[in-house]
Amino acid sequence: MEDGRWKMSMKFEDLESWQKARALVNGVYTLTRTGSLARDYGLSNQIQRAAVSIMSNVAEGFERVHIGEKLQAYNVARGSTAEVRSLLYVIEDNFPGSASSAGQLRTEAVAVGKLVTGLIQSTESRKSKLGSLLSTLFSLLSPV
């Protein structure tokens, strides 16, 4: 569904990137509610917010009408995937009991990042095609 084909009836919940981001959020919440990590409120809160940001910005970008706004939201989502991955290294390094789960979630975050990059590339392609179409149209309408 995220290969550039767009349907009027499609919802952000239909996007694979949003679905995978939602699963990542659930994994992050599960991880941060266990063991000594549950007592590190600052780190837990930060990674939770970053994970939610991915999911929310994919949804927001999909619902935006203007291509520039779509790209901005998708780029924020992509940046948040990097933040989640980085924070998972902090967890892995400082909470040995959570290292395995952190590594698994980092793999999921990489996959989500690739899907978000696909959304960005698809949107940029549509922007480029629209620009070319408008340029051609204006050249045809311009008086000689």
Question: What is each PLM-predicted segment?
Answer:
Residues M1-V144:
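Short, C-terminally biased terminal segments at protein or domain edges
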